């Protein structure tokens, strides 16, 4: 449920963001996502991935990519868990940095 302060600012059906498709099969298209769309997605991902407050998420996806933003960053904020982000170019230069970072963070 929305807090009373949040519900004064926006309604669940209000437009939250326009997410552009990659355009891999044509011109990129803007997809209108409501607050409800995003909150529902976050809830489903939380349940499907069995995320708990004890979890830490490590990833290298940029925030301009939909999964980097919605599937990683916002999931961490929504669940109030630790997010460790590896810069994408660092990962591309040295993919083993991912495993090194996991070892370091344990």
Which residues make up each language-model segment?
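Single conserved hydrophobic/aromatic residue that forms the stacking wall/gate
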Residues: 1-10
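Conserved sugar-transfer catalytic core signal across GT-A, GT-B, and GT-C glycosyltransferases
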Residues: 5, 17, 72
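Short secondary-structure boundary/capping segments
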Residues: 9, 27, 34, 73-79
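Short, well-ordered beta-strand segments
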Residues: 16, 56-58
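Conserved AMP-binding A3 loop
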Residues: 16-40
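AMP-binding (ANL) adenylation modules
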Residues: 61-65
């Amino acid at each position: 449920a929305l807090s009373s302060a949040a519900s004064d600012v926006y309604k669940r059906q209000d437009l939250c963001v326009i997410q552009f498709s990659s355009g891999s099969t044509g011109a990129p298209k803007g997809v209108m996502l409501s607050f409800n769309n995003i909150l529902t997605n976050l809830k489903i991902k939380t349940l499907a991935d069995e995320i708990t407050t004890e979890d830490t998420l490590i990833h290298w996806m940029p925030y301009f990519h939909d999964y980097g933003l919605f599937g990683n960053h916002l999931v961490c904020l929504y669940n109030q868990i630790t997010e460790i982000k590896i810069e994408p170019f660092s990962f591309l230069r040295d993919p083993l940095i991912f495993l090194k970072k996991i070892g370091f963070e344990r």
